[in-house]
Amino acid sequence: MLNSDNTNPFHTFTIVRGDVSKQYIEALENASDGDDSGLLSLINSDSQLANNLTLQECDVTEGRKECSKSDSALLMVGLTPLDDFGERLHFPTDSKVRERLGRYPWGDGNPLSYLRTWSGNPPESPEDVMILLDKLDEGLSEKTRGHDRFEKSSFGTLHGILNSDETKTLERLLSSGSFKVRADEPLDGGVADIMRHLKIVVRIAVKNNLGLLHYSH
């Protein structure tokens, strides 16, 4: 998706609730297919999730059909993390990191596109960092989910999401340098640059025991 200036979209990595993200996403999908039971069970057992939706005038206690908002909007709203006072947790990262990852000077401007093209998993590594990068980049796509209800939204494109455990694993792999760089990468130090800035974002999520969402607009 291009913005109105025909430039590449701006990519954002933001903290989300990673403790219920997998269950919530699956519940939304099942509800769209006519089975509200998982969604209702989750709403009834998770007051923060229920309150998030209610604050956005989306009461689904009587079923998904009672809320006209899209699945992508419900995903963003429902997984918004709150502090002890019920206020939204803000991403405490600096503008330099945000700008560096926002519109990378290569290809489609997506920093994960560059990583997935020019880096890889070391052959001796027992864990594959690329699997997590793939999920963060395409986990909510039509190609992965079989529908475009998360990928397409009025505010942009939701690319992928990692739950809390996956985010912790990614932080550990990035910190240990568990990735390799292709010798022919076009931007000298490009992979290392993206990994360095991405690690800052991931560490913030891990510090707060949260997951990570990748979207563009």
Which sequence ranges carry the predicted segments?
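A cross-kingdom marker for long, charged
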Residues: 211-213, 217
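Intrinsically disordered or highly flexible coil/loop and linker segments, enriched in small
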Residues: 204-211
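Acidic (Asp/Glu-rich) sequence patches and key acidic residues
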Residues: 1-200, 204, 216
